[in-house]
Every structure is written in C-alpha cells, then in structure tokens.
Amino acid sequence: MATESVRVRDVLRIVGEVAAYRLRRLEMANMAGAAGIAVALHLPPADCAVRLCFAFGLNLLVYLNNDYLDLADDLLAPGRDDAKTRFLRDHRRAGLVAQLGLVVVLVVGAALVMPSLLLPLALGGGVCWAYSARLKAMPGADIAAMIAWGAAMPLVGSPPELALGWALVGWLGLFSGAFEGIQVIRDHDADAAAGVRTTAVALGVGRTLLLVRVMLAASAVYGALVVSPWLAALPAAAMLVPLDRSAPRPSGPGVDATRMWNRVRLLLGLAFLGALAWVWWTGSTHGVLVQVSRATVLG
C-alpha cells in the first residue's frame, strides 16, 4: 500500500474548510465571548487582538480534532457525507499534520507573546479531545465536559489572575451545559440508532429536558448571586421555553429541539451581552452575594 503524501495545499484546504463550515454554522461563539470579556475588562487593543487571534486558532484546532475523530460517524450521518468530509477521509495524514501544525503554532505563539494563554489551550484543547474521543458517549460526562469546555475556551479573553474573568466564564460554562443537554435531546434518535449512549439516550428525552431546566435554574441562581439579579431573569425565563414534541420530520412526528435551541440561545446571549456591558461600564459585577471588580486579583 502506497504511503499517502502530504501536500501543503491539502493541509491548508482542510483548515480553511473547517473554518468556513464552523463559522457558517455560528459554532465559534466562544470567540465572541472571549473578545467581549477582553473588551469588558478594558484590556489594551493590542492585547485584545492577540487574544482574538489565539481564540480563532484554538477553535480551528478543537473543531478540526472533533471532525477528525468523528470522521466515521460523519460519513454515515445524513447530510454530512459531503465533499469536505470525504476530502478529510481521503487525506487523513494531511488532517493529522494540520492538527499538529496548529498545536505548534499555538504553543510557540503563546510562549513567545503571552504565556498565560497556554492555560486555556491546555484546558480547552484537552477537554475537547477527551469529549470527542470518549466522553461524548458517557452519560453525564458529556454534559460535564461541555460545562468545563464552555468555561475554558472563552478564558482566552482574560488574564488568569483576574477574578472577574473567572466569574464571567463560570456563567458561560453553565450556559454551555444547558446547550449540550438540548443538543443531546436533538440528536437522541440518531445517537440511539448508532448505539451512542449519551445522557439523553440513557435518561430519555423527558428527564434530560428536566436536567436542562435544572441547569438553566443553576444559571439563574449563579447570575443573581454573582453577576446581576436583573440579568438572572433571562436564564430563568429560558426555563419556560418549550420543547416541540410534534414537529414534522422525514421519519414522522417526533422531537425537534431546534426552536428551543434558538430561543434559549437568544435569551442567554442577551444575558451575557448585558453582563459584558455592565462590567465594561461599571468595572464590576453586581450580584446580591458578591461583586467582583476588575481590580480583584486572585492569590
């Protein structure tokens, strides 16, 4: 069997297609979170630019790794056996080289310019790899991993010694857990058919939906205690968003989580934008339990 050669243009094509596909699907929202946190913390413009570039590179790495590890499943999934997926299948070594290249660029770049970025690289990249390789098929661990990932990725936007950055990404982590719950509800039928044991497959749609509402309640409580009781009303309102259980589908009536996903995303997005605006304007959160300011340094 001939050894597959690796061409630079194949590597660049794979990276470019990952970027285009994920940006088109609005799946790099953590970049906006990182950029918003950096601006809210009043970091210098050059600092913000470095962090945004790093966030983009980190997103390329984790999503390419996800596509690489999910390749076999994607080829069988409806609508995913496209030219992009087939190209990655036919150029696996180029996909591996692309990942290694991104790791080198991110590690060297962070070490030379901003060593503190190695922390979100290790946390975000490590959690995403573990999720794609194993945790996504472990009930409970799939949602826990996305809570950790949802906090780790936007941590790019904050120096790790600033308590305010941690307070904000903690809220995003809870949001991410709720979104993962909705996602596994959406994918319940396909995962069950493929033998993938997610939280929704293990618990069923009804109990997973209850878990999503519990996580939204936790987000509301966290928001009231740490961020703002007024903004906490938005994740509380998200608890009331219904799940469409009778949507028409090719296989007949069933559960369609798309509408719920979009409505919850709108409410939680507005909550976080409000938090960023408040922090940018006042320099502090305004929770009923704690107020974390830009001047608060850990340790």
Regions found by a protein language model. Give the residues of each.
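Acidic (Asp/Glu-rich) catalytic motifs at the cytosolic membrane interface
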Residues: 55-82, 176-199
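Intramembrane alpha-helical segments
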Residues: 10-13, 83-164, 244-246
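Functional transmembrane core segments of multi-pass inner-membrane proteins
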Residues: 38-46, 143-192, 206-219
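Small-residue-rich segments of transmembrane alpha-helices in multi-pass membrane proteins
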Residues: 29-37, 143-160, 200-205, 259-279
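Membrane-embedded alpha-helical segments that form the functional core of polytopic membrane enzymes
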Residues: 32-68, 117-129, 164-182
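Multi-pass membrane catalytic core of lipid/isoprenoid biosynthesis enzymes
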Residues: 71-116, 196-228
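C-terminal ends of transmembrane helices
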Residues: 63, 67-68, 72, 126-139, ...
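Extended hydrophobic alpha-helices typical of membrane-associated regions
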Residues: 12, 225, 230-299
